[in-house]
Design a protein with these regions (language model features):
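Bacterial N-terminal signal peptides that target proteins for export
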Residues: 1-9
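Structural beta->alpha junctions
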Residues: 34-37, 83
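Short amphipathic alpha-helices within nucleic acid-binding modules
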Residues: 40-42, 84-95
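Extracytoplasmic
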Residues: 56-57, 91, 95-102
Length: 126
């Protein structure tokens, strides 16, 4: 059930992200679980801070989406961070390794645990 749910979430995310405005995009996906006593709103608040940081310090073209389960385990969720190209993704990783961004990383660890991640290149079907 867990694998089916994850497959559905990934498929829905890719369908959404495969629009022409995301042609040849780089997408980082993270499969995560809420820590005990935390809510999705807690994670979304931290993710908003993360997005604001990368938009201000790297590129305004970075988009982050939060995927929650429609059915099944509501504690499992995913992030899909979309970058216009691999160079922007690499610049983001460098920016996130800075001391200024370490506080945001700690905030994620306080509310969630991410067990999987993947970096995808999306190409439109012709």
């Amino acid at each position: 059930m867990k694998i089916r749910l994850l497959s559905v979430l990934v498929a829905v995310t890719f369908t959404f992200l495969s629009n022409s405005i995301f042609a040849d995009s780089i997408v980082a996906t993270y499969t995560c679980k809420l820590k005990e006593g935390k809510k999705k709103e807690d994670v979304q608040a931290v993710n908003s801070k993360w997005l604001k940081y990368v938009n201000e310090n790297v590129s305004k073209d970075i988009i982050s989406s939060f995927g929650s389960a429609v059915v099944g385990n509501q504690d499992i969720f995913m992030f899909a961070d979309t970058y216009p190209d691999l160079e922007t993704w690499a610049k983001t990783q460098t920016a996130l390794d800075s001391e200024a961004a370490s506080e945001i990383d700690g905030m994620f660890e306080d509310v969630s645990h991410c067990s999987e991640n993947r970096l995808w290149k999306l190409e439109p079907t012709k």
